């Protein structure tokens, strides 16, 4: 296969940069200058047939000569207004790469609330000993009843972790195999009886607002809401009201409607709320592993083999 022209605008560190330069064909790579949105970068992008990174959606209209774009993310809602992938273009994402770190962060946030770590860290700042006050309030994950919305890579990994802790888990998905909950009625009943409601859903036309005011208010007073999916899935105003009025037991939020949150946002001051600030998928070798994923797919592309993790714009995953 002829040498491909490759445009790279993904966020890289030095090890990832070196790996790309040592692996890809010499003379085939153009690294974007930052900021990415510039006439120079657009001109380079328009001459490439492979892109690694998330370019503005407007760059795909009119359709470029691009044949394959490897996103540096799982989510791709910013491309869904395209309605369809330009003819001849395949888009892949990083499905599965963030499953373990995102699930670990969710568990860490839950344990912080259940084991009183949030209160103890706050007390440490003022040198206050709270052992006798905190200890009787500590809870275990063991035997907790959990509902997971979404049965993709993050949802499945989170389920595995919950089951390892001895939780009783049910998953909600309309089509994915292995999920026990399929209907809206089944989901409503499960949310109303759960100790933990964990959302791992992408943003699609079907999921936006799925966790609405009625469902949030139906949660038990001790229940904790977890979101590692997308902020748009949740009625955030209703969630904040329930947290402020102590109608639910707390929240662990990796994602929010607005990112970054402005300093005056009410979530900052909600009690028993852990804000992970969209760090859930992060880990030390994240950028290197993103690059390895791209290079593995590049090898398939060069051989004419099917690529991993081809997205469906219409479905949103």
Model-predicted regions and their roles:
Residues 287-317:
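NAD(P)-dependent dehydrogenase/reductase Rossmann-like domain
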Residues 87-145:
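Phosphate-binding beta-alpha-beta segment of Rossmann-like dinucleotide-binding domains, i.e.
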Residues 109, 261, 270-292:
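Adenosine-phosphate binding glycine-rich loop
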Residues 1-92, 192, 212:
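An N-terminal-biased, well-structured beta-alpha scaffold segment characteristic
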Residues 175-266:
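Rossmann-like adenosine-cofactor binding region
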Residues 164-180:
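NAD(P)-binding Rossmann-fold cofactor-contacting core
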Residues 95, 139-163:
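Glycine-rich adenosine-cofactor-binding loop
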Residues 72, 90-97, 173, 278:
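Short beta->alpha connector loops at strand-helix junctions that form conserved
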């Amino acid at each position: 296969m002829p040498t491909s022209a490759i445009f790279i605008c993904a966020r890289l560190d030095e090890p990832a940069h070196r790996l790309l330069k040592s692996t890809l064909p010499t003379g085939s790579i153009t690294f974007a200058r930052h900021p990415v949105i510039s006439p120079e970068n657009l001109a380079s992008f328009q001459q490439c047939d492979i892109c690694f990174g998330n370019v503005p959606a407007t760059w795909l209209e009119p359709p470029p000569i691009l044949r394959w774009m490897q996103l540096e993310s799982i989510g791709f809602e910013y491309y869904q207004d395209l309605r369809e992938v330009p003819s001849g273009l395949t888009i892949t994402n990083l499905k599965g790469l963030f499953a373990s770190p995102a699930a670990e962060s969710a568990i860490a946030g839950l344990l912080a609330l259940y084991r009183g770590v949030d209160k103890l860290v706050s007390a440490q700042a003022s040198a206050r000993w709270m052992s006798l006050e905190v200890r009787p309030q500590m809870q275990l994950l063991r035997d907790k009843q959990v509902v997971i919305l979404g049965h993709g890579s993050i949802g499945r990994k989170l389920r595995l972790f919950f089951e390892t802790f001895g939780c009783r888990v049910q998953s909600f998905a309309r089509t994915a195999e292995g999920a026990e909950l399929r209907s809206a009625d089944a989901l409503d009943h499960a949310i109303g009886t759960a100790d933990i409601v964990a959302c791992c859903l992408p943003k699609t036309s079907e999921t936006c607002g799925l966790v609405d005011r009625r469902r949030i208010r139906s949660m038990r007073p001790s229940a904790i809401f977890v979101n590692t999916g997308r902020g748009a899935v949740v009625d955030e105003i209703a969630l904040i009201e329930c947290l402020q009025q102590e109608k639910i037991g707390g929240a662990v939020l990796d994602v929010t409607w607005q990112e970054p949150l402005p300093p005056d946002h009410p979530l900052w001051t909600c009690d028993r709320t852990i804000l992970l600030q969209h760090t859930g998928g992060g880990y030390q070798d994240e950028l290197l592993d993103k690059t390895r994923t791209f290079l593995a797919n590049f090898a398939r592309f060069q051989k004419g083999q099917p690529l991993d993790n081809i997205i469906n714009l219409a479905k949103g995953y």
